[in-house]
A protein has these predicted regions:
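N-terminal amphipathic alpha-helix/helix-capping segment at the start of soluble metabolic enzymes
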Residues: 1-21
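Surface-exposed amphipathic alpha-helices with a cationic face
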Residues: 10-14, 85-92
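Hydrophobic faces of well-ordered beta-strands that scaffold small-molecule active sites
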Residues: 20-22, 48-50, 97-101
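Active-site beta-loop-alpha junctions enriched in small/polar residues
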Residues: 25-27, 53-55, 100-104
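Glycine-rich anion/phosphate-binding loops
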Residues: 28-42, 75-83
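Glycine-rich, proline-tolerant flexible connector loops at the mouths of alpha/beta enzymes
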Residues: 49-76
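Conserved small/polar residues in nucleotide/adenosyl-binding loops
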Residues: 107-109
Length: 109
């Protein structure tokens, strides 16, 4: 398979370096700022990972839990996460992005 993710790992391997992936919680700060943050970090990484905020992120560390709570407090919804990705891919169509979330959040879509 020749996905953007496999291409990113192949490019890093050719350069004899590890691939750099970053994670940010969608909606942390604001929806608009979340897109700006994602665009900004994408300039320096191989793959972006964007998390769906969850109200009980027990499997995450403290910093991600706090980010998720802020995002929820700011009104982020699951459809907003997809909107952020859609707008991001309009600008950075060749940058791989991985979505991460809890199964229980996603089955209710």
């Amino acid at each position: 398979m020749n996905s953007l993710i496999s291409k990113a790992f192949s490019a890093a391997k050719k350069e004899d370096r590890p691939a750099l992936l970053t994670y940010t919680v969608a909606g942390d700060n604001t929806k608009k700022k979340s897109l700006e943050i994602l665009k900004s970090i994408s300039n320096y990484v191989d793959i972006c990972e964007l998390g769906f905020p969850h109200n009980t992120p027990i499997a995450d560390g403290g910093q991600i839990q706090t980010s998720a709570y802020r995002a929820i407090k700011n009104g982020i919804k699951i459809n907003d996460v997809f909107s952020i990705v859609k707008n991001f891919k309009k600008i950075k169509k060749n940058k791989p992005i991985i979505l991460m979330g809890y199964y229980l959040s996603l089955i209710h879509i």
